[in-house]
Amino acid sequence: MPNIFKAIKFYFAAPKPLPPGNYAYQAAPDAPFPYRLHLRIEADGSGVLILNGSTVLHLNQTAAEYAYHLIKGNPAEHVGWQIATRYKTSRVKGQRDYGAFTEQLRTLIDTPDLDPVTYLGFDRQTPYTAISAPYRLDCALTYRLPEGVDTAIAPTERVKRELSADEWKKIIDKSWQVGIPHLIFTGGEPTLRDDLLDILAYAETNGQVTGLLTNGLRLADSAYFEQLVRTGLDHVMVVLNPDLEQSWRVLEVICPDDLFTAVHLTITPQNKAETPSLIKRLADMKANALSLSISDPSLAADLENARELAANLGLSLVWDLPVPYSSSNPVSLEIAAGEYAEELKTEGAGKAWLYVEPDGDVLPAQGTNKVLGNLLTDPWESIWKQPH
């Protein structure tokens, strides 16, 4: 009789997660699944999959196992048997679900302007657990600002120097070695660095997903924009100055391209009346997503109206990107846009993402004063073990 109870306990027990670690797959050009995959499996069985170096997929335990089998090249029949054994389901269903998973990956690859961060199997609001490394590293390449902009907007007094391109490459390599799949390059104005293209291209050689946060004005130069795209840049967010026609011309250049484009808009007392028309104009230009902030708490109702309008127009809302210091987004005035945004930043800061200043110092998030260490000179373990 005890053996029966033991068997029942085994039948209903949750399957033990696969071994945590990093796994890679690079198919031959003529392979049936000719893609590049990097998978990070966490101790709880969930995973992060980088698809073709351009999209980060957050996976629940079952989806992470499917990705593991795909990377290992296991036949569908074997996968079906493994899933059936581990999850007490039929072999046919396990094989069918595995086929549906691989087909979903193919669909994502073929989707234009795909969101660079996608969730399979659970909600974006899933709390951050004891992950082995952040999902994203926000790299402020410089705190310099365009000529004519008040330098007091950016915290230039915090840093004594900017890292060189070679030093940033060492940081990029260190981030890749610990399994960080997503790099954001921000500022200040990152396009003021002449070596930006070199830094972006280097991250692409690792297969990391890269994003650029900028005022965008230099992107109005179509030749420069094409160079950025050729480096492998995966997404861009433009901090919009709605009163500057050149800012709109930038969007006319980049929105038609097959590049996920988000736009940040700060709602102020001066532009709140025209905010609905601004958002409609962005939707008409085929921007993919919208980031919002307000310059004063009294604008909370305007923010909520803007959120609803954006959703109705099909614009995704982005809350967790570190908006560059700029005249259109003075840090002293920016306020988190809504309760969900504040919760997201609180939950994710120092866990899902870290912020690296121009000299390599690491902060839990943009705008915080706690230095966890220096990513160029300190061991990763000493930084990650710091209380965040």
Identify what each model region corresponds to.
Residues 1-64, 68, 128-130:
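Acidic, low-complexity/disordered tracts enriched in E/D and polar residues
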Residues 1-10, 55-139, 166:
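Long, charge-rich, low-complexity alpha-helical segments
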Residues 129-167, 178, 367-368:
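Canonical Radical SAM [4Fe-4S] cluster-binding loop centered on the CxxxCxxC motif
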Residues 136, 154, 165-186, 193-302:
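Radical SAM/AdoMet-radical enzyme domain recognition
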Residues 307-336, 361-388:
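C-terminal accessory region of radical SAM enzymes
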Residues 333-347:
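Short, basic/aromatic recognition patches
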Residues 347-351, 369:
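Short, small/polar residue-rich loop motifs at catalytic or cofactor-binding pockets
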Residues 356-357:
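Short, acidic, Ser/Thr-enriched surface-loop or helix-capping motifs
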